[in-house]
Amino acid sequence: MTVFEALHEIGGVLKYGIPEFRLPNKIVDVEIDGLRKMGVRFEKDCIVGKTISYDDLHADGFKGVFVASGAGLPNFMNIPGENFVGVMSSNEYLTRVNLMDAANPESDTPVLQGKKVAVIGGGNTAMDSVRTARRLGAERAMIVYRRSEEEMPARLEEVKHAKEEGVEFLTLHNPIEYIGCLLYTSDAADDLI
């Protein structure tokens, strides 16, 4: 059996979507090693349908193909300002922090480490994102959720941990627009802040 992994790191959402503080990578690595010992092979940086086709797999002797496409694409709200620098999906944020060293300002793709961070949503991914932002130095981090706290899909334990870490909760609210501004300096004429 061969697993074709699209990313450069094996483990899927367990590695790129769940922060280390909630699921340590070494635990995921133990599971991956167990699969290897059972004979499972892993090929990284391989997108079935792009890097390798179904016909290629069939020609290579694969008798069956199971498509496990992983976490779905994020849902965007389609409101003005979604494309501003610093506004991103939790999927992108967590992937960049977890796999691309984006918490390091010297990395090739650093994330803005805002002092004030708002995460829109009430699920486990939102809790992971807001708690990650706190760990990256956000002095004020808040969850903005359109329903009540009791209606949040996040596990109660995740909400509890977020509160213990100082996360604020603004429920029964939903953004209708993200507002940004341009800061002009003599060095960079069009840096969005």
Model feature map: region roles:
Residues 79-93:
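A short, gly/pro- and small-residue-rich
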Residues 63, 85, 115:
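Conserved acidic residues
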Residues 83, 178-182:
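Short acidic-glycine loop/turn motifs at beta-strand connectors
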Residues 1-5, 43-58, 69-76, 92-156:
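Rossmann-like dinucleotide/flavin-binding elements
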Residues 3, 7-37, 42, 130-177:
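Rossmann-like dinucleotide-binding cores of NAD(P)H-dependent redox enzymes
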Residues 10, 47-48, 188-189:
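Hydrophobic pocket-lining residues within nucleotide cofactor-binding pockets
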Residues 184-193:
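Single conserved hydrophobic/aromatic residue that forms the stacking wall/gate
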